[in-house]
Amino acid sequence: MSDKPASMYRKLSKPSYTRRDYVTGIPGSKIAQHNMGNLQTGPQDYPVQISLRIEEECQIRHGSLESARLSANRTMLKQVGQDNYKMVLRKFPHQILRENKQATGAGADRVSDGMRQAFGKPVGTAARIQQNERVFTIYCEVDDASVAKDGLRRAYNKMSPPCRIDVEKGQKLLIS
């Protein structure tokens, strides 16, 4: 069965639902890694820091975060090389998403319970993100800043809320 549209889970309308001790059957996170590029270097080793910020509070599902991570990381790997940047995914999908499955087709009314006991079963996880919070950060050299911006633009296209790309460190180096 395919995933429901992300618009079902985007709004922060329900209380946080994160206690994995009490919930069984939670699907695993699709996010493979949170730190990419040259893992031996720190953020202080790079003159430029560029981040992708979300402009409104929302929930982003783990599949969307992973596809955004893959596209940004692949762009950086191909054009810059693994040793010349560091990329960090700053959010972890703690929020458990539930869905009340509905039977469809012939005889569904006899099989389905409708809205009786409609709490729902876990179908995935999402990260809760507040307004103007950073999701991805790329640390790179001055020459690679345009590639980093392009990678974050590709990541932005994989997520539904409006985003912006901020140069947080090294703005003066990029202008000159």
Curated annotation (Swiss-Prot):
Protein name in the entry: Large ribosomal subunit protein uL16
Q: Which family does it belong to?
A: Belongs to the universal ribosomal protein uL16 family.
Please provide the Gene Ontology terms (biological process) for this protein: translation
**Which Pfam family, an example, fits this chain?**
Ribosomal_L16
Supply the CDD domains for this chain: Ribosomal_L16_L10e (cd01433)
HAMAP family listed in its UniProt record:
Ribosomal_uL16_arch
Provide this UniProt record's keywords sorted from A to Z. Ribonucleoprotein, Ribosomal protein
Positions of disulphide bridges = none
Q: Does the keyword NAD apply?
A: no
Keyword NAD included in the entry's annotation: no
Which superkingdom heads the taxonomic lineage of this protein's source?
A: Archaea
InterPro entries, from UniProt? Ribosomal_uL16, Ribosomal_uL16_arc, Ribosomal_uL16_CS_euk_arc, Ribosomal_uL16_dom, Ribosomal_uL16_euk_arch, Ribosomal_uL16_sf
- One GO cellular component term noted in the UniProt record for this chain: ribonucleoprotein complex
GO MF terms on file? structural constituent of ribosome
